[in-house]
Structure formats: C-alpha cells, structure tokens
C-alpha cells in the first residue's frame, strides 16, 4: 500500500462525492419524481450504487487499491449509459433497443434539459468523471513512485 499524495486523496474524495451525488439524483428521480427505471437504468444503478461504498472505503483507508473494481465498473457504466443515450436519441438504436424487456421502454425520455441532457446523459457524465479522476489518481501515484 503506497501512501496517497494529498492531491490523490482530494481526487479520491471528489470521486466519492460524484458517486454519492449520482446515487442521490437517481433516487430523487425514482422516489420523489416517481419515474420508473427501465432495464438499462437498472444496469446503470447496479454499476453506480456500489461505487459510493467502494470509493468511500478507499477514501477512509487512503488506499486507491481498494477502489480498483470502481475503475472497471465506471468504465462499463460509461458504455451502458452511452448505449442508453443512443437508444433514446438515435433512430437506428431506437428500433434495435428501444423496447428492452422490462415494463418501461428504454427509449422513454423523462427529462430533456436543454434538448440533450437526459438521465442516461447525466449518468454517463458521472461515470466519465469517476473514470477519468481514477486514472488521474493512478497517474499521480505513478509519478510519486
């Protein structure tokens, strides 16, 4: 276990905050706004929710090695949310994957801020931020070695 630099500690805390905000936003839309999640939304939740715990433990222990699964989960989550966004906004993807297999079609757009920001877009940005910040921590630790 290598000691984290102060910059890496701050980035790790920032990742945890991002994961927590994504979890809170997801719960807000489903529990307060009563939006029923589609199948792809559930996959994104499955990949995002554990990140709060994973990065929280890593931040408390001050050890990025605890968070290695988070790098993979955020990368996969980014791919899922990108596909989901394409299902919502690109006609060829709507025909192929619009129905999903759940009770709510995956091409339903509950929110559309500024004409392009939907829930999968917000999830994708969160996954991207987590993924990039994790890579920055690894680079920072590599410089320290």
Swiss-Prot record:
Gene3D superfamilies: DsbB-like (1.20.1550.10). GO terms for molecular function: protein-disulfide reductase activity. GO terms for cellular component: plasma membrane. It is found in: Cell membrane. The chain crosses the membrane at residues 9-28, 43-62, 69-86, 115-137. Signal peptide: none annotated. Keywords: Cell membrane, Chaperone, Disulfide bond, Electron transport, Membrane, Oxidoreductase, Redox-active center, Transmembrane, Transmembrane helix, Transport. Belongs to the DsbB family. BdbC subfamily. This is Probable disulfide formation protein. It comes from Oceanobacillus iheyensis (strain DSM 14371 / CIP 107618 / JCM 11309 / KCTC 3954 / HTE831).
């Amino acid at each position: 276990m290598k000691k984290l630099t102060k910059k890496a500690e701050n980035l790790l805390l920032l990742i945890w905050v991002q994961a927590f905000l994504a979890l809170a936003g997801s719960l807000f839309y489903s529990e307060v706004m009563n939006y029923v999640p589609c199948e792809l939304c559930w996959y994104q939740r499955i990949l995002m929710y554990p990140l709060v715990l994973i990065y929280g433990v890593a931040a408390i222990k001050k050890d990025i090695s605890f968070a290695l699964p988070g790098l993979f989960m955020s990368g996969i989550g980014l791919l899922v949310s990108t596909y989901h966004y394409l299902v919502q906004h690109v006609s060829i993807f709507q025909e192929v994957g619009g129905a999903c297999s759940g009770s709510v079609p995956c091409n339903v757009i509950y929110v559309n801020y500024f004409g392009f920001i939907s829930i999968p877009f917000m999830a994708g940005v969160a996954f991207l931020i987590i993924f990039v910040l994790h890579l920055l921590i690894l680079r920072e630790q590599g410089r320290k070695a």
